[in-house]
């Protein structure tokens, strides 16, 4: 069926016949298919040299939003292929990676203009082979973890610390005290993990075998 689609400011404004809007650019798409934009849930483009902060078992305090490169030609290629939105993820060198960036691709814009505002919060985790291969062998003989049991212990230790940190802040806030000098020390790493415990941040996790998936859940 022959139909017009009116697009304003990057969004569909109307669908119908014989639509017009002053000086709008007209694209004749007869014989072609029009589909919704593709959402890429797992992407590493536009963050060259900023993917992995793998020096520690956890880098939950860092965010991919700080290293988005709006001049990466892959943005243009993604748009040409129909990708409109992506989740840009930290790498998988450590069990607990950095915070993700949710972006809507626009060519020729500043990095800040690509970031979704008030979007759901995400963070990158990794299990099994990703972490083990980053740490394994003679190059890193003393790096922890090097096994699946070590990866599991990392999550146990960090979430226990995050639970204690979150409880300390909740007790302080409930006390009604206004003296910030007596407040718990702010820790962005544990604060991020506490958001997961409070269902305010979601995990995107590289996974391999059933046992470790069940472990994380």
Language model feature labels by segment:
Residues 29-101, 109:
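Metal-associated gating/positioning segment near the N- to mid-region
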Residues 13, 19, 45, 93-94, ...:
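Glycine-rich nucleotide phosphate-binding loop and flanking beta-alpha elements
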Residues 79-217:
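Polyanionic/metal-chelating signatures
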Residues 24-25, 60, 201:
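A structural micro-motif
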């Amino acid at each position: 069926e022959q139909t017009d689609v009116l697009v304003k400011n990057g969004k569909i404004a109307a669908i119908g016949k014989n639509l017009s809007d002053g000086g709008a650019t007209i694209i004749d798409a007869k014989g072609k298919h029009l589909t919704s934009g593709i959402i890429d849930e797992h992407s590493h483009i536009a963050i060259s040299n900023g993917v992995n902060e793998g020096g520690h078992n956890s880098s939950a305090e860092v965010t991919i939003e700080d290293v988005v490169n709006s001049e990466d030609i892959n943005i243009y290629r993604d748009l040409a292929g129909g990708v409109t939105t992506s989740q840009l993820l930290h790498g998988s060198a450590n069990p607990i990676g950095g915070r993700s960036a949710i972006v809507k691709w626009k060519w020729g814009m500043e990095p800040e203009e690509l970031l979704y505002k008030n979007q759901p919060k995400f963070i990158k985790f990794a299990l099994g082979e990703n972490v083990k291969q980053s740490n394994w062998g003679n190059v890193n003989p003393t790096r922890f973890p090097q096994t699946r049991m070590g990866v599991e212990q990392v999550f146990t230790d960090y979430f226990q610390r995050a639970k204690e940190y979150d409880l300390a802040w909740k007790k302080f806030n409930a006390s009604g005290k206004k003296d910030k000098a007596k407040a718990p020390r702010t820790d962005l790493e544990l604060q991020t993990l506490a958001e997961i415990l409070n269902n305010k941040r979601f995990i995107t996790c590289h996974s391999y075998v059933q046992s470790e998936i069940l472990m994380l859940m």
